[in-house]
């Protein structure tokens, strides 16, 4: 049965995926009983990620949150199967959120999430079919860039995605006397996590505006930071702690959530959940609070930036240990002129870039001209004999990775990931794309 919001199974998909159909439908936000397609979709996603599958009120809560995000789902099914009665073999979600390209500068981005393929159907082209179809759809909608976070680092480059931001997992030794390099100001107030329902999103949006590389948050964070997941203690809370920083005038400027890991641990530890600061003073005050928690000897944080600000907050930077560093945000440019016109610049410059793109969206030779903080990108046709002479040749994955300025084009040249036709061109591109603030993605999706 084809519902009004379905995309009917298409014969071209069956040509690529024999015996399979592709369906597309929105996350309505309705309970599972009213939207069994989405209930089965979410169940498949959780199983394919080896997660616990929610049911009852917990499942309905997740469905409602995904509806608030405006997600559109794609599922690959056995031929002629009804998505309301069959589990999808492949899953994919896409939705639009703002990408911060500079301070107070945003572009709408196509966010990709919940991409899975059942283990029994690997290497049949299911992922490629879903990804290419949805990137085509994003282009048709006029979205200049796509974004995702990758469960595996070797999957998405083939589709033109490049790493644009990184994050660290850190441990802070708080035993003994810990001091900050500069005194904190304002005050810290402990609050019930549920008090963050309104305050949290407002502060996040203010921090977002100052953080190139971050994206608008998904609705699930309002539940995570208020400790109200129905799958855990029926939404009544599980011991999450929350603290809000107020400046000297009493205005909230930031907040942090954290959880004690238990007295059975050899070293008494708290794990930071979410830390949002809209000012440098707020960031300093929140860490002043965390490193001076009574009885605690270690603070763990799984979403630390690469900028080493945390180390510089402390008089003893060796108290901070990085236990893991990994890629966070992957970007994929879909419209070269729109993407580069949609970010700020700190200097003037001009470069000719020859871009290869296996999907064709960004392919071509482009002149990037920046004057007075504004970029204009024009196509020059094919490079090579008789055509435009590029300064650099690179794949769209590399172009997407360096786009925000958090990844160096010069380092990619040294790694052999791009080709320089004019000496110094990679360093020029690095300088031209330098960000106005450290590039970091504050959130997952």
Segments predicted by a language model, with ranges:
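Intrinsically disordered, low-complexity, positively biased terminal segments
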Residues: 1-39, 50-53, 187-445
